[in-house]
Amino acid sequence: MHFVECTVNRFYESNSMIHRSVLVGSALLLATAALAASPIADRQAVMKSFGGATKPLAAMLKGEKPFSLDDVKKSLATYAEGNAKFVTLFPKGSEKGENTEASPKIWSDAAGFKAANEKFKTEVAAAQASIKDEASFKATIPALLKNCGACHESYRVKD
């Protein structure tokens, strides 16, 4: 028995750096997995950021808030940032759970969903390039927001 203990101890001592590396790597992997949110939570966070970005735009359109080019730029940047990863947040298997409002049509009409996202991406980029003042804002933003609403009509289920 003593021989086995000595052999095991020598093995661990001689390979302690390897064992530490494996242990640290495993701990990092587990921590990363634990911190990673679900696709449903991730896409809900993106949609929440879109909602926050839309509020000042809608308020400016209604005359409830003075026009601010800085606020417009911030909102459009939020749209662009969220849209860049949005379509990746709908993997198969994330159709149900966690109070999702995602319509099954997202998966049955994946090409249409991706096309709607591409259209939004294009409209956001065009708005970023063209909005320079209140007049160009009022000429551009209503169509962009209408596109958001159309996507919600097609690809969102409200309880």
Label for each model-derived stretch:
Residues D159:
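Short Cys/His-rich "knuckle" micro-motifs
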Residues Y12-V24:
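Bacterial N-terminal signal peptides that target proteins for export
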Residues F3, F11-Y12:
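Aromatic (phenylalanine/tyrosine) cluster motif
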Residues L30-A37:
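Sec/Tat signal peptide C-region and signal peptidase I cleavage site
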Residues A37-P142:
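Extracytoplasmic c-type cytochrome modules immediately beyond a signal peptide or single-pass transmembrane anchor
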Residues L144-Y155:
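The canonical Cys-X-X-Cys-His
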